[in-house]
Amino acid sequence: LTAVGQSLNILGSLISAVCILSYCGRITKFYLAPDRSLNENERLADGFEQTTELIETPTSVNWKYEFSYQGKTHIGYINELAVYRASFVIGMPGTGKSHSFLDPAMKQLIAKHFSAVVYDYKDPTLSNAVYQYYVAYKREHPASTLRFGYLSYVNINHTYRCNPMKGISTSAEAVNFAITILTALNKNFVEKQGEFFTESAKSYTAIVIYALGVLFGGRYLSLPHTLTMLSQVPSVLFPVLKLISVLYPDMKTLFSPFKEAYDTNTLPQLQGQLASAQIGLGSMSDASLAYVMTEDEESRDIAVDLDTISSKESPMLLCLGSNPRLGAVLGLANAVYLTRIANLLNRKGRNPTAFFADEVVTTYINGLDNLIATARSNKIAVFLGFQDFSQMVRDYGQKISDAIVNTVNNVFVGAVKGKTAKELAESFGKKTVKKISKSITEDGKVTTSIAEHKEERITQSMIEELSQGEFVGRIADEYGKEIKCKVFHGKVIVETPEKEQRLREELENRTKNECERDGRSYLPDETPWIPKVRNWSDEEIKRRLRLNVIKINNEVSDVLLKLNEIADTYKILTHLTTGTDEFCLRHYLAEPQNPQKRINLFVWLEEAYRIVWRMGELELKDDILSFEEKFQLLLRDVYTTSYEGLQQILKAREQYHAMDLNSVKQLIDEYEDEYGTNLVNP
């Protein structure tokens, strides 16, 4: 029995030891063995479902990219089907905004028969690419009427010429350009609209633009002429502007803020009101800007008509160059170009057009928010590039910046930091993630459970840590072309077909040969591939640009000389109307029955008729008023004392048959014969 008991005891001990070892093994395996559920959690949380199907339409833009999802790398496609709902590409310098997104978009839309406007901040980088796509398109479609245009302030031998202000004819357009010019000069202007001095500067600039638009058929209306005119002393300009406003009611409205100061001859006050319209104008005097933004008879064949960019009959690809070294000067010039283009494009029934503005905050596009809001109905694909939301707020103001950002439907994001990254991460929403967890029971069994929870689809840290060429974003779809997976995160694949590479090498080699013949160095990032339209030496360029500036200054001077002659007569008429001298009009109105006082009326009428007659020399645009209608407007402008006096003047004209200049001169001669010439010496 003792032996049996010992045996049983030993057996029990062995069984207990085995059980203990088995239990310990399970615990060790649970805590120390590689955790498959953790690996599975990482796999399940890796990325999110994205589009792997290429969806092309006649107006789509498509990018190939690779992305990670559940531990595997996939090839996907960013299918931008709603190109008319605007796009922005945001990212710090070096993220690949242009190379990854803007350049492929330009290539594809040009191939799909779009017109295009391209703001090339680092001229001629994008311009060379557009020209390459233009050449490729023309080879594929030799009968096409598509044209190419290039405006550059640094490559004068290659540049076309274009006056963006040509054709402005309404006060609304003049005000719009005034805002554009002043905001380009001072980005804080947009936030100060409504303030007294800001509104005065805006009205004054608008009046000058309007006046140049109506004088001499508008042929002196350009940005260089406007800047030259604005640099004049206000006391010289105001009599001229006041006189012209007599015949144009909408211009008269613009003049109203200055009327009291002008009527009371408090011109120093006017100078204070207009200081912000003149600050910085000296630095805007640039000869290359003046050359590109004006036209002459010799340049008609290379003059760009902005109104024809989106023409169905002869659409155009227009590249607008800039240069970081001339930021302020060219920012103003390009602001005027892009604002005008945006207004002209935004109409129905035109050719589909792409509007590319990389580094858009380096200029100011007045009405950009409206262009984006209405682009879909007018078939305009807007693509904007910038570095950070704070830039937009700084240069466009909070309200306009919010309107731009919140109405753009297609968003492409490279690496950005801080608040911008946080806001964008939140905008991409959350994703559902399955999480596997396991536990061990008291009896040693391991149980596994699966739960779902929400995580940010794209986190702030993901955006901040994106590598070059990596982007996140969201695209919009169209009715009937719905896209399930709108958000993407991956590395864009930019492929260059062999045919495209051969064309690139052909254009580059041709340019290198031209540089060699001309004794110039070929600089890959600075030399345009675009053919020359003139072949001037550096000295000849300087001479031509200088002569053009002199021509502009002389034209403005001649305009002012002609206007001042008439304005001097206008001053005399105003004095004869309100003054108390011997020959002033009030003496006649006080004693209309006194024969010797009639000369006051006749002298006044002679000066008024002379003004109306001489205004015909100004070749006023849309001059549809008769001599009598102009006289009536002039009369009501200078005589504001009483309605009775006004009627008295009109009746006296008829009574004495003094209805034109010749009849009044005859009446004055008769008066001199009767009373002696010594009485008539006003």
Feature names for model-found ranges:
Residues 591-624, 657-680:
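Repeat-associated, polar segments at repeat-unit boundaries in modular proteins
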Residues 1-49:
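N-terminal accessory nucleic-acid engagement/regulatory domains that precede
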Residues 47-76:
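N-terminal pre-Walker A segment at the start of P-loop NTPase domains
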Residues 584, 588-592, 642-645:
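Acidic, low-complexity, intrinsically disordered interaction modules
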Residues 372-374, 378-476:
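Conserved ATP-driven motor cores of ASCE-family P-loop NTPases powering translocation/secretion/packaging/pilus
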Residues 473-476, 585, 599-601:
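Carbohydrate-binding surface patches
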Residues 439, 443-566, 573, 619-623, ...:
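Conserved P-loop NTPase motor module
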Residues 32-38, 70, 74, 78-380, ...:
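P-loop NTPase motor domains
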